[in-house]
UniProtKB/Swiss-Prot annotation:
GO terms for molecular function: cholesterol monooxygenase (side-chain-cleaving) activity; heme binding; iron ion binding. It catalyses: 6 reduced [adrenodoxin] + cholesterol + 3 O2 + 6 H(+) = 4-methylpentanal + pregnenolone + 6 oxidized [adrenodoxin] + 4 H2O; 2 reduced [adrenodoxin] + cholesterol + O2 + 2 H(+) = (22R)-hydroxycholesterol + 2 oxidized [adrenodoxin] + H2O; (22R)-hydroxycholesterol + 2 reduced [adrenodoxin] + O2 + 2 H(+) = (20R,22R)-20,22-dihydroxycholesterol + 2 oxidized [adrenodoxin] + H2O; (20R,22R)-20,22-dihydroxycholesterol + 2 reduced [adrenodoxin] + O2 + 2 H(+) = 4-methylpentanal + pregnenolone + 2 oxidized [adrenodoxin] + 2 H2O. The keyword Oxidoreductase applies. This is Cholesterol side-chain cleavage enzyme, mitochondrial. It is a peripheral membrane protein. Its cofactor is heme. The gene is Cyp11a1. Interacts with FDX1/adrenodoxin. It comes from Rattus norvegicus. It is found in: Mitochondrion inner membrane. The lineage of its organism: Eukaryota, Metazoa, Chordata, Craniata, Vertebrata. Heme binds at residue 459.
Amino acid sequence: MLAKGLCLRSVLVKSCQPFLSPVWQGPGLATGNGAGISSTNSPRSFNEIPSPGDNGWINLYHFLRENGTHRIHYHHMQNFQKYGPIYREKLGNMESVYILDPKDAATLFSCEGPNPERYLVPPWVAYHQYYQRPIGVLFKSSDAWRKDRIVLNQEVMAPDSIKNFVPLLEGVAQDFIKVLHRRIKQQNSGKFSGDISDDLFRFAFESITSVVFGERLGMLEEIVDPESQRFIDAVYQMFHTSVPMLNMPPDLFRLFRTKTWKDHAAAWDVIFSKADEYTQNFYWDLRQKRDFSKYPGVLYSLLGGNKLPFKNIQANITEMLAGGVDTTSMTLQWNLYEMAHNLKVQEMLRAEVLAARRQAQGDMAKMVQLVPLLKASIKETLRLHPISVTLQRYIVNDLVLRNYKIPAKTLVQVASYAMGRESSFFPNPNKFDPTRWLEKSQNTTHFRYLGFGWGVRQCLGRRIAELEMTIFLINVLENFRIEVQSIRDVGTKFNLILMPEKPIFFNFQPLKQDLGSTMPRKGDTV
C-alpha cells in the first residue's frame, strides 16, 4: 500500500525549497522542475508544468502495474511529493492538471463561470448514451443543467425545505437504534459486536426514500423487502464496476461483452427500473390523497410545482436515490470508526449532544442547531475520508495557476484527499480533531472544507446528507458507546468512492439507563 511506509514531507514549495515541517517522518521532498512559484512576470507554458511524461499509454501501463486503480488517492499523494503542489498527468487519453493548495482551489472555483462543467464518469455516460436513458443534473450541462438545478435547489437546498426533513429523518434514525438493540438481544452478550455496513446502507436508503417520497419503505424492519435490497446491491455494484473503465474506453468493454460491462449495465438497469417503479407508485398514491398531515416529500413538491416535465423529475429522482446510499453510509461508517479510535473526542461529542437535548427539550429541529462540534466531526471525517478523492472543473477560459498558463477546456482536479493529509493546511493531519473546524480564522478553514464540492455545482444532496448524518449521530451517541474490535488501521481503497479495505467490526455498548433518563424527548417536561 503506497501510503504505508511512504516517507514524505510537505508538498508546498516556496522558491523550490520544501517546508521543514514533515507530514510523515522520512526523506525530504524532491521539488521537481518548476515545482515552486516562479518569480518571472510572464506565466510559464502548460508543457512546463511538472509531469511524469506525455505518453499517456506508458503512464497508464505503469499506473496499472502499480495497482493504482484502487489506490489512486495514494498515487496523487506520491506525485505531489515528487513534483510539488501542481502537476499534470496523462493516463491513457485523458490529461489533467492536479492541485492541492486551498488558495489554488479558490482561484479555480472563482473562475468557473455560471455553468460549471465537471468530469463525468465515462462508464456512466456510456451506459446512458447507449441505452438512451434520461439524464438529470448529474449529467446535464449549460442551460439545461441550470434550469433543473434551480428548481431542485428550492426543494432540497433551501432552509424552508430542509426543516421539513427533520421529523422524517429522526424517525429513520430512531429505527436504526432499534436495529442495534435487536442485534444486542440476538447476541445475548450485553452488547453488539460486528460489521454494520449493510445496516448503514439500508439506513441511508430508507432516509433518502423517506425524504423523496414522504413515506417509509421498511428497510430497517426485521424482514426487508428483497426488491429494495436489490436496489442497494445494484448501487454498490454500479460504483464497484465503474473503476476498471475509468482509464480505458468503456465502449471497448461493451463491444467485447466483458463481465465488467455486463455487470455495470445490469446494475444501472436495476437502479432505473426500481427508481421508476418507486416514482410511479408514489405518484399514483399521491394523486389519491387529499389530506396531508405531514410533509409529503420532495417528489410531491416537484410534481405540484409544475416547473419540470415529469421525465426530468424521474431522471433527477433516480440520480438522487442512486447517489444517496453508499456516499452517506460510508461517511457515517468512517465517522463511527474515528470516534471509536478517539474515545475522548467521542465523550466530548456525547456531552454536547446531551446538553443540546436538555436545552432543546427534545426538539430535534432545535437540537441540530446546538451541536457545532458534532457537525465539525462530520467535516473532520470528510477531511480524512472524502467521498470523492478529487473535485474537478473544466476551465472556461485560460487560467494562470502557480505562474503556469493552463489553456481553456483543460480538466483541473483539486486533490481533496491529498489536501486533507497535508500538514501545511492541517497541523497534525492524521489526528482526528473536530475542534480545528471551530476556529473562526479564514486562514484555518478557507477552501479547506470541500467535502460536498463547492459553488453552484456542489452536491445536490448536501443539506439532506448533513442533516441525516447529524440526526443519526445524535441518536447513536445518546444510546451507545462505540468501540472497534481492532486498533489496526483498516486502510482505504478507491471504488469510485473511498471505502475501507476490509470490514470494520464495531462494539456497541448500551449506555446506562440512568444516562438515558437525562435525555428528554420533545414534549417531555424538564
